[in-house]
Each structure stands twice: as structure tokens, then as C-alpha cells.
Amino acid sequence: MKIAFIGLGNMGGPMALNLHKAGHTLRAFDLSADACKKFAAEGLPIAKSAAATVDGAEVVISMLPASAHVDGLYFGSGDQAGLLEKIPAGTLVIDSSTIAAATSRKVAEAAAKRGIAVIDAPVSGGTGGAIAGTLTFMVGGAEADLERARPVLEKMGANIFYAGGAGAGQTAKICNNMLLGILMIGTSEALALGVANGLDPKVLSEIMRRSSGGNWALEKYNPMPGVMETSPASKNYAGGFGTDLMLKDLGLSQENAAAVRASTPLGGLARNLYAAHSLAGHGAQDFSSVIKLLQTKGA
């Protein structure tokens, strides 16, 4: 299958590479010359522009940082035309960016008028899942379009869920990430309290992991350095899912909550804590570094 892939960041790059390795004919692009150079060295064909990727493509995939980037890509900005004016009718567009559900619906509605099918398919699983091809896709759009996309998604992920109409995938994603942000703060708070009282963080982590407080962070992503060798915490919080990305997703959750008048007090508090953590200079560190905000000074 001929696929255009736009966005070769920490997630998009490995996803595109998995499609290339699976035998699909790819043309990829990123605004970052370094990203293009990195994946070209791994054999990924790189186009000169986003517009150049879609020529002859049966499927267009985008993996971009925020709503504004997706809006600019498909609708254009200034004198530059958007991709919707270049993508032929009958093409399937898969947007795996995590953005506002309203933006996904806007793109899908405009595309439908041109005979272009669009699904929003944000992912969960982190960079490790992107590399291993074990991501979880949360899909919004027409169910028939998901079935068209399934052979492509299966080369990048292990779990594919149909959430509903356009924008539903985005809503599912921000619900998941709101819970993840809250969960990480709660886990960090408990560990910081235990350590402040002289407990060994490894022992406390195991106690909680095997008790009613057990959760994904304790199992896979412990925020305390030295407890879990594979977690970003033991690598000076490098890599993983950045604090600023978590802050963005929590912001999306609160915008959505306000739009539908849903009560999310813990989501709002989590957003405020991550905002404070980012302002303290930790925006580029993994989101589990929020434990620094909660630790007793001098501990």
C-alpha cells in the first residue's frame, strides 16, 4: 500500500519505520531536518515537503504535536494551501495526533465534502510501544473507515478500539491521559510521604504494588529513581512522555470538560501541578518527574 506519513517525532518516526519494514511503500516528511536525516539513515524514504508525500498515496497518516499543527497541515496557513486541497477523493486519512476532539471533527467534516475519509486514531503505549509496534489505537470516525485502516494500524499496534464517531478517539485518549496524570501524582505523593518517613522506596513500592494501591505506575513506570531500572526515573527522567506533553493533554481534558459541563476537579488540580512543575524548568523531563514537586525539601 502507498502511504504518506507526516510527523517523524519520538512516536511518528518509529511508527513510520514499522510500516516501511512491513513492506508498505512510504514517503515521509517532517519539518525537522534532523528527524528526516535520522530516519533516512534507517532506510525511510523522505519527501521534500508534506505536499510531496501525498502524491499517489492511498493512505495519509499524520502524527503532529498539537491541534494548531493539524489545522495548519490540512487547512493551510497564509498563502500555503492545506493538504485537503491536494489529497484526491477516495484517500483515507489517519490522524494519530493527540488534539482537541473539535479539531478532529472539523477536519473530518471538511474532508468528507471532498470525498476524503478521515479517522482520528490517537495512541497510547509510549515510545517503547511505537518502536515495538504494540501501541493501542483509539479510533473515532466511520466504522467502515476503521476497517479500511485496520491492516495499516495492525502493523503499528497491538490493540485497536473503536470509540465512536469523529472525535471519539480523541475523547477516549484525553480521558485515559487525565487518569494517567492523576495516577502518577497520587503514586508520587505516596512514595514521597513514605521516603520522608524513612521507608525504603523499593520496599514501599512492592508493598503498594501487591496491595489495594497497586497500579500501572508501580508496575511499569515507578517515579522514584533507582526502584525500577527501566523507568525514566532511573535515567534522570530522560525520554519517555514529557511533562509538557502531559500538561498539553490535561489542558485538552479540561477544555473538553468545560465544553460538556463535566466535573473533573482532580483533572484540574493535576493540570495545575504539572503547570507548576513545567514552570520550574522540568517541561522536557518525563512526566514522572512530577515527584520532584512533591518531595520533602532536602530528602
Please identify what each model-predicted range represents:
Residues 26, 46, 117-119, 160, ...:
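Hydrophobic beta-strand scaffold residues
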Residues 1-63, 91, 161-162:
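NAD(P)+-binding Rossmann beta1-loop-alpha1 motif at the extreme N-terminus of oxidoreductases
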Residues 169-269, 273-298:
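Helical "substrate-binding/catalytic lid" subdomain
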Residues 50-62, 66-117:
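Rossmann-fold NAD(P) dinucleotide-binding segment
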Residues 8, 98-177:
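Rossmann-fold dinucleotide-binding core
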